């Protein structure tokens, strides 16, 4: 069993490995970079290199003024071409191209996660997802039909975006009108009744105006899971004025609706590490795994959401070297769901007979009825200039943002128990009814920032940046009085049972100072080494707009607590080789997270907890030859508690839901003018599970490999087909597990997707 929990290769100490990697990669990269260069006496031939469609050279965010190859951060840019070739229809699928990033956590106890529940380097990053550099709120699945590229930055992003997760951020870049006309359409069918269509129309009007329309529709069952369905539709019209001139105006709108049947997971009975929760239920130790197709929800389970986003961006080129941009965005994400979760503790199991096939587990109804809104105005100025002999690449700006969240209180839904091995979903508890016991959160933020990259010599650069956020968060919540169970409150005199009673009404204000500094030295024209240090903070309420009263319990959102603080050090090297078609990177990193909440000996709580995530990461992106494209990477990361209570089920100091080893690689080859072949593999190492007192549940998930493949055929310039096969070898694996360990989400089995792409 121990062998299954480790990456199937000999492990090296990370520092030794990285030192060897840097020593080894430098001469190899130098040799590759020199390939095709002429001697001094040879005739010089200037030949432009075609940019790789797998390795965008520049971030679309103006806050990152340097090319990806000269950015002193670990950054992965997933291009639209990669997304299309892999048939990745949502953000979670696209992020499979980034090692160690994924939806590994299935929720707390009786609660389950929904949407893009992303973990990165030991931390929940689902609230650090941005669209065009603006925070996108909501636990929904984000479709890629209107996405130009996805930018993943590892390490603190507080200097770039303000309050954020301590270990990274994700930025989805929207499609914009272009100065050319064309139509791209696709129609897909696949396993589990998968049906999807997209349309991308760009039309030039006159010399400087263009309109673009992106449309999407998708209906599918979840492969390998009975009753689980997904249905979503989207439309994204946009118009641009002044293209090719010094003044440009972009107007964008996005509307997406989703009607899904959520998946609460299946019991972990029979998984490695599972044992019955009591002597009386010992039969479960040898009764075998449940059928992974089983659905433990009800016919009334649903997950509906609506996203509406309107954006206006104006750009003005003051001169050839200076541009000012102003962006205004309003966005609203509404979501409501009823999702069933199962609990398998000793008190949750009913045994009508000795036959385990008659046993039941209790069901819990997870409910949510929430509305998230954001209104922001952001101004950015970028400029390149010299002071004496020192070059400057400056990005500076101000931001005004109001974010609000309303969680509508709903009456509890009671569900009957469910048979462990033969679940029945034909139950109709009804929908949600609001009871007025709402929770309201609002955060107003004013931010100012300035970044500069200083070109000291031709080969040596210094960079730094600072951001000041002034924030004010207000929060109030109510509870329906007279209920029972955890969190119940009695009704005040004269107040009827079930009436909402305010339990929290508080606010918190403060200032956050985040900063970063780095240095880069070009060893050659195509290769560099760099160092970087960054500081990021997350204040109470910064993650979910919820606050807790001063002195009340162990919540990190207490108003008397300090912001969580993360410090990251990184040293790395980046090389553009093979005529700059291929980017190779390697980095060694360490992130220390401070001010974590821990319990004192007297039962009170303080912020003396510390976590650390350290390791190394290597990556590759671009073209090996003009016909051979590749993107991938490998990371080794050790995430531990340095000070405070251990939170892993096995009692170790490891942080849960973080694979120590992770690998991903996708490669595509254009075999002929009309035929292309692609293949990829991913490895997710063993992960520790969190601890919450559950008895007998698995303490870890086993590592696994998954392979995918693609075959493309071009009929003519207007039509091509592609066949994608996912989980080629039909690997059985645990995709995510919840904190208690009573339930998990099985990985998707082997599936097929056939797509017709049309171009006009």
UniProtKB/Swiss-Prot annotation:
Alphabetical keyword list: Cell outer membrane, Ion transport, Iron, Iron transport, Membrane, Receptor, Signal, TonB box, Transmembrane, Transmembrane beta strand, Transport
Motif TonB C-terminal box: where in chain: 743-760
Residue ranges occupied by any TBDR plug domain in the UniProt entry: 67-175
Membrane topology: Multi-pass membrane protein
Domain of life, per lineage: Bacteria
Disulfide links within the chain: none
A GO CC annotation given for this chain: cell outer membrane
Localization in the cell: Cell outer membrane
Gene Ontology molecular function, alphabetical: siderophore uptake transmembrane transporter activity; signaling receptor activity
Signal peptide annotation: 1-31
InterPro entries assigned: Plug_dom, Plug_dom_sf, TonB-dep_rcpt-like, TonB-dep_rcpt_b-brl, TonB_box_CS, TonB_rcpt_b-brl_sf, TonB_sidphr_rcpt
Domain TBDR beta-barrel: 180-760
Pfam families in alphabetical order: Plug, TonB_dep_Rec_b-barrel
Function: Involved in the active transport across the outer membrane of iron complexed with catecholate siderophores such as dihydroxybenzoylserine and dihydroxybenzoate. It derives its energy for transport by interacting with the trans-periplasmic membrane protein TonB. Can also transport catechol-substituted cephalosporins. Receptor for microcins M, H47 and E492.
PANTHER family xrefs: CATECHOLATE SIDEROPHORE RECEPTOR FIU, FERRICHROME IRON RECEPTOR-RELATED
Entry's family note: Belongs to the TonB-dependent receptor family.
Name the record gives this protein: Catecholate siderophore receptor Fiu
Species of origin: Escherichia coli O157:H7
Gene responsible for this protein: fiu
């Amino acid at each position: 069993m121990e062998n299954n929990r480790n990456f199937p290769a000999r492990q090296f100490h990370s520092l030794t490995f990285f030192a060897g990697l840097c020593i080894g990669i430098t001469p190899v990269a130098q040799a590759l970079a020199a390939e095709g260069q002429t001697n001094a006496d040879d005739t010089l031939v200037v030949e432009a290199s075609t940019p790789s469609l797998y390795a965008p050279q520049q971030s679309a965010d103006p806050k990152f003024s340097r090319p990806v190859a000269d950015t002193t951060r670990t950054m992965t840019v997933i291009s639209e071409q990669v997304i299309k070739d892999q048939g990745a229809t949502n953000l979670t699928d696209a992020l499979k191209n980034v090692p160690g990033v994924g939806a590994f956590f299935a929720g707390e106890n009786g609660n389950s996660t929904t949407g893009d529940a992303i973990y990165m380097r030991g931390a929940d990053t689902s609230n650090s997802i941005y669209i065009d550099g603006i925070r996108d709120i909501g636990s929904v699945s984000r479709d890629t039909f209107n996405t130009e590229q996805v930018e993943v930055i590892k390490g603190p992003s507080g200097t770039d975006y303000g309050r954020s997760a301590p270990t990274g951020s994700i930025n989805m870049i929207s499609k914009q009108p272009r100065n050319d006309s064309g139509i791209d359409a696709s129609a897909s069918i696949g396993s589990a009744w998968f049906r999807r269509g997209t349309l991308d129309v760009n039309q030039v009007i006159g010399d400087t105006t263009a309109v673009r329309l992106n449309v999407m529709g998708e209906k599918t069952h979840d492969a390998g899971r009975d009753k689980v369905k997904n249905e979503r539709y989207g439309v994204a019209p946009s118009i641009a004025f002044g293209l090719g001139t010094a003044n440009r105006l972009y107007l964008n709108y996005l509307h997406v609706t989703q009607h899904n049947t959520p998946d609460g997971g299946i019991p972990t009975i029979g998984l490695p590490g599972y044992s019955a929760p009591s002597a009386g239920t010992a039969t479960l130790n040898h009764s075998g795994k449940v059928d992974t197709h089983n659905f433990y929800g009800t016919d009334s389970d649903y997950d509906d959401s609506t996203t509406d986003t309107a954006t206006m961006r104006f750009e003005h080129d003051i001169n050839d070297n200076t541009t000012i941009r102003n962006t205004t965005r309003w966005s609203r994400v509404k979501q409501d769901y009823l999702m069933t979760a199962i609990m398998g503790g000793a008190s949750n199991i009913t045994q009508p007979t000795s036959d385990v096939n008659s046993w039941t587990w209790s069901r819990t109804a997870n409910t949510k009825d929430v509305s998230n809104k954001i209104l922001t105005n952001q101004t950015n100025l970028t400029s390149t200039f010299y002071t004496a002999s020192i070059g400057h690449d400056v990005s500076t700006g101000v931001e005004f943002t109001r974010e609000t969240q309303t969680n509508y209180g709903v009456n509890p839904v009671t569900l009957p128990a469910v048979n462990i091995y033969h679940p029945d979903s034909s139950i109709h508890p009804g929908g949600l009814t609001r009871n007025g016991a709402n929770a309201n959160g609002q955060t107003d933020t004013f931010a100012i920032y300035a970044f500069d990259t200083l070109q000291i010599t031709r080969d040596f650069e210094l960079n730094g940046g600072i951001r000041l956020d002034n924030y004010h968060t207000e929060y109030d919540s109510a509870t329906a009085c007279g209920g029972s169970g955890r969190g119940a409150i009695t009704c005040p005199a004269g107040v009827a049972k079930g009436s909402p009673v305010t339990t929290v009404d508080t606010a918190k204000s403060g200032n956050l100072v985040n900063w970063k500094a780095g240095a880069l030295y070009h060893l050659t024209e195509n290769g560099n080494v760099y160092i970087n240090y960054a500081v990021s903070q997350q204040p109470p309420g910064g993650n979910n707009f919820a606050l807790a009263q001063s002195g009340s319990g162990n919540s990190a959102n207490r108003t008397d607590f300090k912001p969580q603080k993360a410090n990251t050090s990184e040293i790395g090297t980046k090389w553009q080789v093979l005529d700059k078609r291929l980017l190779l990177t390697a980095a060694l990193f360490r992130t220390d997270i401070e001010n974590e909440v821990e319990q004192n000996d007297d039962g009170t709580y303080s912020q003396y907890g510390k976590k650390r995530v350290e390791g190394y990461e290597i990556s590759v992106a671009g073209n090996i030859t003009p016909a051979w494209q590749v993107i991938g990477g490998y990371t080794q990361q050790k995430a531990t508690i340095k000070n405070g209570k251990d939170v892993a089920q096995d009692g170790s100091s490891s942080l849960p839901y973080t694979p120590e080893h992770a690998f991903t690689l996708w490669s595509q080859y254009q075999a002929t003018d009309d035929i292309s072949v692609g293949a990829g593999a991913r490895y997710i190492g063993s992960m520790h599970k969190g601890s919450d007192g559950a008895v007998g549940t698995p303490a870890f998930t086993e590592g696994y490999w998954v392979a995918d493949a693609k075959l493309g055929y071009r009929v003519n310039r207007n039509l091509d087909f592609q066949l994608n096969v996912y989980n080629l070898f039909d690997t059985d694996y645990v995709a995510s597990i919840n904190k208690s360990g009573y339930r998990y989400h099985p990985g998707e089995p082997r599936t097929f997707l056939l797509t017709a792409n049309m171009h006009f």
